[in-house]
Amino acid sequence: MNTLFGKAKEEAKPITPKSVDEYPEAPVSLGITLVNFTGDWRTFMPVIDESKCVKCYICWKYCPEPAIYIKEDGFVAIDYDYCKGCGICANECPTKAITMVREEK
């Protein structure tokens, strides 16, 4: 979302670092989700119906976290330690093999 208006927008210069060292410090580091587990705040969790799965791996491709992995038999599985419950996997699944169910506490 662009939050600059008027003169500030006209005079703004794009930030295009030439190397990784030129990027400004950020409060989030790369790979942070591999260190921090989801916790108990998730309200919905994906459940996979292997009878509907066609092993297209679209869910794996679109998952924004390292939460979906491919098992030895070729089916996908969910690592609930990393799953945030966003539902992108269920939304993108072409065969609706993934459904979001309310997390039981």
Swiss-Prot record:
Q: Any idea which UniProt keywords this protein has?
A: 4Fe-4S, Electron transport, Iron, Iron-sulfur, Metal-binding, Oxidoreductase, Repeat, Transport
Q: Paste the cofactor note.
A: Binds 2 [4Fe-4S] clusters.
EC number assigned by the record:
1.2.7.7
Q: Which reaction does it catalyse?
A: 3-methyl-2-oxobutanoate + 2 oxidized [2Fe-2S]-[ferredoxin] + CoA = 2-methylpropanoyl-CoA + 2 reduced [2Fe-2S]-[ferredoxin] + CO2 + H(+)
Where the record annotates domain 4Fe-4S ferredoxin-type, the positions are 44-73, 74-103
* EC supergroup of this enzyme: oxidoreductase
Q: Which InterPro entries match?
A: 4Fe4S_Fe-S-bd (IPR017896), 4Fe4S_Fe_S_CS (IPR017900), PorD_KorD (IPR011898)
Cofactors, names only: [4Fe-4S] cluster
The positions annotated for binding [4Fe-4S] cluster 2 are 63, 83, 86, 89
Its domain of life?
Archaea
A Gene Ontology molecular function term of the record: metal ion binding
Q: Per UniProt, where does [4Fe-4S] cluster 1 bind?
A: 53, 56, 59, 93
Q: How does it assemble?
A: Heterotetramer of one alpha, one beta, one delta and one gamma chain.
What name has this protein been given in UniProt? Answer: Ketoisovalerate oxidoreductase subunit VorD
- From which organism does this entry originate? Pyrococcus horikoshii (strain ATCC 700860 / DSM 12428 / JCM 9974 / NBRC 100139 / OT-3)
Taxonomic lineage is: Archaea, Methanobacteriati, Methanobacteriota, Thermococci, Thermococcales
Task: Name the gene.
Answer: vorD
